[in-house]
Amino acid sequence: MGKTTWLLVLGLLLGGAALVAGMVLLAGRTSSSIATQQNNMTTATLQVRATTFNTDYARNADGPVWDLFDPQSQAIISRADYVDRHQHCPRPGVAPRITGISTGPNGYEIVNETLSGTVLHDYWHLVGGTWRFNLARSNPSAIALYREPRAKYFADLGCTK
């Protein structure tokens, strides 16, 4: 091969390498951009889910609230018992205001909220692609209450039943 042929081959190789490198860089940026967009969409979805959860809780729509519990939380109290206890001991109709969402440990997202000046932290995580509320992390004291006999539960909360 002559000198001109070698220069042509070298030029093609360098051009091809530059093209591949450029494609890799663009792919990296695109996947990063896609990951950022997906994370933003996921956070937006969580915000909507948590807002619905809080609104239902404030309205005493207890079945839909329990439905958003994760399996660990649903194992603590049955849906029927949760609904019954909350129907007989309703909460005031004020929903907390979401102030932000932050990344927590072990795949949980923390929905930061305020309610009448009290700061609350609800822990949510994806289960099968759906945001689910974790009672044990969000409100550990509720677990002890739900395990009490009904009469003691109502007495402890000052409810009539």
Q: What is each of the regions a protein language model found here?
A:
Residues 39, 47-57, 63-108:
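Short solvent-exposed beta->alpha transition segments
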